[in-house]
């Protein structure tokens, strides 16, 4: 008799757990659907760099930090995924400057975008990251020796990266990241 009560209680608890998990999962999906439909600009801003087809139905929004080792490691994999699915995926990059000195590198990227060299500059940054992006001792000045590989006008980069509009882009991306939790 005790076994039947124990077994019955276990089945009820397992069923309750499964129902609660399913409910939670559905609520999360509804919440993200609501965010996507009612706050589309939270995912993609006019200033956001994009890669892939404009007609893509799948948007991959990545909040990244140019000083992040994981971001650098995943970048080639993301590009492979986009290339393996031509016309189907659009990558949207947003900024999440979590590491010391990241704002500096984002400003360089945004200045490079004005020269039409955003993706080349990001690739150079990711490849040279071990030389300048120590988490305990970042050395932003060291990036300048690698930037000529992106074909940039370095004097213009130094001027453009101080534009207050770039700071507003960083602030907007941080605010959107917080909104999305």
Residues covered by each model-derived region:
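Extracytoplasmic thiol/disulfide redox context detector
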Residues: 1-101, 162, 166-181
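Cysteine-centric redox/oxidoreductase cores and disulfide-bonded domains
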Residues: 2-6, 10, 22-25, 97-181
């Amino acid at each position: 008799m005790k076994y039947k009560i124990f077994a019955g209680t276990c089945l009820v608890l397992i069923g309750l757990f499964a129902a609660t998990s399913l409910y939670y999962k559905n609520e999360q999906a509804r919440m993200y659907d609501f965010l996507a439909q009612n706050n589309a600009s939270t995912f993609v801003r006019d200033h956001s760099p994009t890669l892939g087809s404009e007609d893509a139905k799948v948007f991959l929004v990545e909040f990244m930090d140019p000083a992040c080792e994981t971001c650098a490691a995943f970048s080639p994999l993301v590009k492979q995924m986009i290339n393996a699915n031509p016309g189907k995926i659009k990558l949207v990059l947003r900024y999440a400057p979590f590491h010391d000195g990241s704002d500096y590198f984002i400003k360089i990227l945004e200045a490079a975008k004005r020269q039409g060299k955003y993706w080349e500059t990001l690739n150079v940054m990711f490849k040279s990251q071990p030389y300048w992006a120590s988490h305990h001792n970042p050395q932003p000045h060291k990036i300048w020796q690698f930037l000529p590989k992106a074909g940039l006008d370095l004097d213009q980069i130094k001027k453009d990266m101080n534009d207050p509009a770039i700071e507003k882009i960083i602030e907007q991306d941080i605010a959107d990241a917080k909104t999305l939790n």
